[in-house]
């Protein structure tokens, strides 16, 4: 099971009714946060989720509305008596930016592990999450993220017995472990069938449409995408500032065909994103204009 919460849906500045865009994932007791702008910890408090289990924080880029909430968030995690390391992930320059922000949060009861992304496409694993980072097209270096909870194939009892694999190792092999036993190397592929569809969520914001977005969001359970402007006359603003129109996002959704799509990162001038919903659903029917606090409980497909 993967729980997703879109903590905020705003871009540029927080508003009384709209926090800045940020997404939290929960799986197997480990939380992953993407972006941490001003007020993110308040949005998390309103949701009722704890900051203590946040093991990973990914940043799309280093504009203030995506990272300025980090010092307070880290201090709150410390006040919650967290002591385990926290992994910070983002484009090149993260160590410098975090170092500057930590001048107002110098003492933490847990270490920070900083990993900078430098390639156009990178993959890493953090706890239960397999994370793909892919570069998008903003005014500064910016990444989108796809998080996946993989799922192994079914356990094949007959294959296990035929290879005389002791039953005491079956559960460990099913969990993906490799075992050395009496001179033999027992591997999961010896007893598991083909991998099954996992759970995937793609999150991207602050970008013009690029092919990589639809590629990574293809057939996802949930696709969370920037929709900065709904008004068609704002297309010049979107192009100049490297943001995305509702209609452009909907076209990416049509191409990727996720099971569900949420728009986020609305311009502060956009009071009622839902006014454009009928228009963009003509492009991609499964698109929604998200609101702060929207959640989804995503599970594996039934066999």
Question: What are the residue ranges of the model-derived segments?
Answer:
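Binuclear metal-ion centers of metallo-dependent hydrolases, dominated by the metallo-beta-lactamase
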Residues: 119-121, 210-303
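Active-site neighborhood of phospho(di)ester-bond hydrolases with catalytic His/Asp-centered motifs
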Residues: 34-37, 54-62, 90-91, 202-207, ...
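General small-molecule cofactor/ligand-binding pocket signal
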Residues: 5, 89, 113-118, 132-134, ...
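Active-site metal-binding motif and surrounding structural segment of the metallo-beta-lactamase
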Residues: 38-89, 113-121
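Conserved beta-strand hairpin/beta-sheet module of binuclear metal-dependent hydrolase folds
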Residues: 1-47, 85, 145-147, 193-204, ...
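Active-site-proximal loop/helix segment associated with metal-binding centers of metalloenzymes
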Residues: 16, 129-203, 207-216, 222-224
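Metal-dependent catalytic neighborhoods of phosphoester/phosphodiester hydrolases
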Residues: 69-77, 98-101, 271-279
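A gly/proline- and charged-residue-enriched helix-loop-helix capping module
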Residues: 96-105, 114-119
């Amino acid at each position: 099971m993967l729980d997703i919460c879109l903590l905020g849906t705003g871009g540029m500045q927080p508003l009384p009714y709209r926090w800045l865009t940020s997404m939290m994932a929960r799986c197997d007791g480990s939380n992953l946060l993407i972006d941490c702008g001003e007020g993110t910890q308040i949005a998390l408090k309103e949701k009722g989720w704890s900051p203590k289990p946040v093991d990973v924080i990914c940043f799309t880029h280093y504009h203030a509305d995506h990272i300025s909430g980090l010092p307070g968030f880290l201090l709150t995690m410390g006040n919650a008596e967290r002591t385990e390391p926290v992994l910070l992930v983002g484009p090149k320059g993260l160590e410098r930016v975090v170092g500057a922000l930590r001048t107002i949060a110098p003492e933490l009861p847990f270490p920070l592990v900083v990993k900078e992304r430098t390639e156009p496409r990178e993959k890493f694993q953090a706890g239960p999450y397999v994370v793909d980072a892919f570069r998008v097209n903003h005014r500064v270096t910016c990444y989108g993220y796809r998080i996946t909870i993989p799922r192994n194939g079914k356990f094949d009892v007959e294959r296990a017995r035929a290879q005389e694999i002791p039953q005491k190792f079956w559960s460990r092999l099913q969990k993906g472990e490799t075992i050395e036993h009496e001179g033999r190397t027992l591997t999961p592929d010896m007893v598991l069938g083909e991998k099954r569809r996992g759970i995937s969520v793609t999150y991207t914001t602050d970008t013009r449409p690029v092919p990589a977005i639809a590629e990574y969001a293809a057939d996802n359970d949930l696709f969370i995408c920037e929709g900065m402007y709904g008004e068609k006359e704002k297309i010049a603003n979107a192009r100049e500032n490297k943001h995305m129109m509702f209609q452009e996002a909907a076209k990416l959704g049509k191409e990727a065909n996720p099971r569900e799509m949420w728009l986020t990162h609305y311009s502060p001038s956009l009071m009622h994103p839902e006014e454009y919903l009928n228009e963009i659903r003509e492009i991609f029917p499964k698109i929604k204009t998200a609101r702060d606090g929207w959640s989804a409980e995503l599970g594996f497909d039934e066999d």
